[in-house]
Amino acid sequence: TIIVDSTVACRPKRNEILEVDIQPDNVIVGFSSYGQATYENAYNAGMGSNGLTSGRHDLLHHSYHAKYPESFDINTDEEYIYSGQFSLTDSLEGTPVDIGKALLSPTRTYAPILNKIMQDTALKGAINGIIHCTGGAQTKVVKFLDKPLHIIKDSLLETPPLYKTIHETTGTSMKEMYEVFN
């Protein structure tokens, strides 16, 4: 597996930093990781980089094991290596893309949206935190609490077709799905 990654660093002014200060009765606003944003040129299935390994091994057929032996850790139990039923070119139900394109959807960047929000002084002043769910998915918010609060997410976005397919074909519990996938 070849991973192409990048890191961006910046040195903003202290007064430009949005401190996380989550309060009781705050409202959580979520952005979808799938579909096609106005600033994207194609459908995005919502697969973030943290879910890619699990997603491809959960969905892709075991024949990829022999065909691409360099694409997995040889120390992994074989039962977990490409244990799915799909080929890369199989259609992903409910989307305009195939399984391969869905798995390779780039991690969505929310920079265009956040840039507009941060330029609006009134909006920026009403925000008590911005949390990107990569690396913890729907449970990541609890890592940013500095006081005992109970987080209630009772109006989640519709489950993306790619995640529905993973859930239905693997039997992975929804609890685990919400802990792993964005």
Identify the function of each model-found stretch.
Residues 1-182:
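Helix-biased detector of long, well-ordered alpha-helical tracts
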